[in-house]
């Protein structure tokens, strides 16, 4: 994919994510971004004397890998790769990249500063993938039983989903897929720490919209967001696409759900559900 087609500097390329290694890299990016930078996860999940940020990252990685793998295996997830990336280890250069997290080590690292943990985990992400946009065909849904370990670890996720569904007053027959290749579900985005501010998320999102319409032939994309920048990009798609903010609320303001408010305590983030129309209905 050329830089002229993507709007990226020449050293960066958009590629389809493939295989278990890309799934691991994507999972590491999303996990690291969530625990250290997310306006939700980094705020509401504080560490204790027995639970460090590193331990949270490892736990989230292990429980979220199924979701990431499902999306990568769909062939509908994209990533931005740095073609001039300088590998930190010879082994990484030989294999094209490698994740060095010690996922089997659950020993507490709470005596280390969060900044130290952040940088150590980042240094161990020795691969050229710098940004991801994960997605899957909504007609081939995720298995709820395989998501349960992630939900048990982060109960705010199913609570947020339930609150979003409660506020979605659309007629399902008007938008839901009745077969494969109709509605794409977006399921995660992240940019590697140190690569922010380059417009990767917007360029990758808009590229996915165009590819989903022209090549994959989807009629719509739905995305749930818990980040203002992501919400802004997806609610203002490039022509000829149009977007509808189907749901918008702040969990801390939900007077009817004390459990939801408690889970999001510490975060003032707005939650949105956005549907992008790629093609007019027949």
Roles of regions detected by a PLM:
Residues 224-281:
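Accessory, usually C-terminal, subdomains that scaffold auxiliary metal cofactors
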């Amino acid at each position: 994919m050329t830089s002229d087609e993507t709007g990226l500097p020449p050293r960066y390329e958009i590629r389809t994510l493939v295989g278990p290694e890309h799934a691991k890299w994507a999972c590491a990016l999303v996990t690291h971004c969530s625990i250290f930078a997310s306006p939700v996860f980094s705020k509401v999940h504080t560490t204790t004397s027995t639970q460090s940020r590193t331990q949270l990252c490892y736990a989230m990685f292990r429980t979220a890998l199924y979701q990431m793998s499902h999306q990568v295996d769909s062939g509908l997830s994209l990533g931005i790769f740095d073609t001039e990336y300088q590998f930190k280890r010879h082994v990484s250069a030989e294999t094209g990249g490698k994740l060095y997290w010690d996922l089997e080590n659950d020993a507490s690292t709470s005596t280390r500063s969060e900044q130290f943990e952040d940088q150590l985990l980042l240094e161990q992400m020795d691969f050229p993938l710098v940004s991801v946009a994960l997605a899957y065909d909504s007609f081939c849904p995720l298995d709820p039983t395989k998501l349960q370990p992630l939900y048990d670890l982060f109960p705010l996720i199913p609570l947020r989903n339930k609150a979003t569904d409660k506020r979605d007053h659309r007629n399902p027959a008007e938008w839901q897929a009745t077969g494969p290749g109709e509605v794409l579900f977006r399921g995660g985005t992240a940019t590697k720490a140190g690569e922010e501010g380059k417009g990767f998320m917007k360029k990758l999102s808009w590229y996915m919209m165009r590819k989903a319409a022209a090549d994959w032939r989807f009629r719509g994309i739905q995305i749930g967001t818990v980040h203002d920048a992501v919400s802004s990009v997806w609610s203002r798609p490039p022509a000829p696409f149009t977007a509808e903010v189907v749901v918008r609320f702040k969990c801390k303001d939900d007077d009817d759900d004390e459990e939801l408010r408690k889970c999001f305590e510490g975060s003032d983030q707005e939650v949105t559900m956005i549907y992008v129309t790629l093609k007019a209905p027949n």
